[in-house]
Amino acid sequence: LEKTIEMLLTDPDKYFMQLAYKEAQQALSEDEVPIGAIVVVDNKIIGKGYNQVEKLNDVTAHAEMLAITAASNYLGAKFLEECTLYVTLEPCPMCAAALKWARMGRIVYGASDEKGGFTKISNHLLHPKTAISKGVMEEECGAIITNFFKGKR
């Protein structure tokens, strides 16, 4: 517990990315694409999600979308300007657009998505005030998804 509190105080991005990574592991255990997301406000988790596209037969059931919905329901508000989204993989264009409309205050992602990430389309998909940080736990976040797809081939 002491180490957890210390990490939260000294490196909150890594702390919350570890929790997003746990969501990705849950997706992996259900044979879903292993991506996890957490929405945080004032160091409190208010939404979380992992990919459930196969389980729900819903192409929009990405980790970010589920986490945004949970956070909005928790707050009773559609705008998340004071919130930070932690997600293990760079959001796709669909999720980036949803993050724009939700006015997410900050996005922290682990690994870049060289094939389907929003930055491959445009850096202007997000709200102009949204701050972006990347590369938190990049190696672990990249490995879980790379290994998943290697196992599928």
Predicted features and spans:
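A cytosolic small-molecule/anion-sensing beta-strand core signal
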Residues: 41-42, 69, 81
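Short beta-strand scaffold segments in enzyme catalytic cores
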Residues: 35-43
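A short, polar/charged loop-to-alpha-helix boundary motif
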Residues: 55-65
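Short loop/turn microsegments at loop-to-beta-strand junctions
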Residues: 12, 33-35
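Immediate flanking context of iron-sulfur cluster ligation sites
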Residues: 77-89
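Short beta->alpha transition motifs characteristic of CBS
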Residues: 46-53, 129
